[in-house]
């Protein structure tokens, strides 16, 4: 069986609000759409944290569980939980094989977490990952910069994924947006 791709996640902090959006498409290999309604963005830690994944679906579930465990262990401290998870992910021979990336955020902090040990906080309050990530990132930056007072974080997140879905064949328009 081929590789499964779970595609685009976009997150934004904007005017005191935060939102994360993900599309619903799961693609096997380069040819077959297997699912249109996957849910790739979740609320964690009593609804105080958002997390979204791009990459292998099975690996993402493992990472969600691991990250939620770290949040519990560090009492909701997002940065500490992300750093400790990245250390464990990078240091464990089996976990290193996982093929996924995560964006995690709370009301004040947004982080990209990867299996190579990176924990990156963006300078501009915007992150995007997955096959349509660059398209969503570009759209989100333009929307945030040029329509800032006219759009909410949720509207920016939704519009950025819509634009990515128009361009990227691995991103669809079944968009789920979560807010904190």
UniProtKB/Swiss-Prot annotation:
Superkingdom in the source lineage: Bacteria
Binding site for Na(+): 165, 168, 171
Keyword line: Allosteric enzyme, Cytoplasm, Hydrolase, Metal-binding, Protease, Sodium, Threonine protease
Entry annotated with the keyword Metal-binding: yes
EC number: 3.4.25.2
Compartments it resides in: Cytoplasm
Regulation: Allosterically activated by HslU binding.
Protease found in the keyword field: yes
BP terms from Gene Ontology: proteolysis involved in protein catabolic process
InterPro entries associated with the record: ATP-dep_Prtase_HsIV_su, Ntn_hydrolases_N, Proteasome_sua/b, Proteasome_suB-type
MF terms in GO: metal ion binding; threonine-type endopeptidase activity
Reaction equations catalysed: ATP-dependent cleavage of peptide bonds with broad specificity
GO cellular component, one term: HslUV protease complex
Gene3D superfamilies xref list: Glutamine Phosphoribosylpyrophosphate, subunit 1, domain 1
SUPFAM superfamilies linked to this entry: N-terminal nucleophile aminohydrolases (Ntn hydrolases)
EC main group: hydrolase
Active site: 7
Its job: Protease subunit of a proteasome-like degradation complex believed to be a general protein degrading machinery.
Subunit structure: A double ring-shaped homohexamer of HslV is capped on each side by a ring-shaped HslU homohexamer. The assembly of the HslU/HslV complex is dependent on binding of ATP.
Family statement: Belongs to the peptidase T1B family. HslV subfamily.
Name of the protein this chain belongs to: ATP-dependent protease subunit HslV
Organism: Bacillus cereus (strain AH187)
């Amino acid at each position: 069986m081929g590789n499964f791709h779970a595609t685009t996640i976009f997150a934004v902090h904007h005017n005191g609000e935060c939102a994360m959006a993900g599309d619903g498409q799961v693609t096997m290999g380069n040819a077959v759409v297997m699912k249109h309604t996957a849910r790739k963005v979740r609320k964690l830690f009593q609804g105080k944290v958002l997390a979204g994944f791009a990459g292998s679906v099975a690996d993402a579930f493992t990472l969600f569980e691991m990250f939620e465990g770290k949040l519990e262990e560090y009492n909701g401290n997002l940065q500490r939980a992300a750093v400790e998870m990245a250390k464990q992910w990078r240091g464990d021979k089996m976990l290193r094989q996982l093929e996924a990336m995560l964006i995690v955020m709370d009301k004040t902090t947004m982080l990209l977490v990867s299996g190579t040990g990176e924990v990156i906080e963006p300078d501009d309050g915007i992150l995007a990952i997955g096959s349509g990530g660059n398209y969503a990132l570009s759209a989100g930056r333009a929307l945030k910069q040029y329509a800032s007072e006219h759009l909410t974080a949720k509207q920016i997140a939704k519009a950025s994924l819509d634009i990515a879905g128009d361009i990227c064949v691995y991103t669809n328009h079944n968009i789920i947006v979560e807010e904190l």
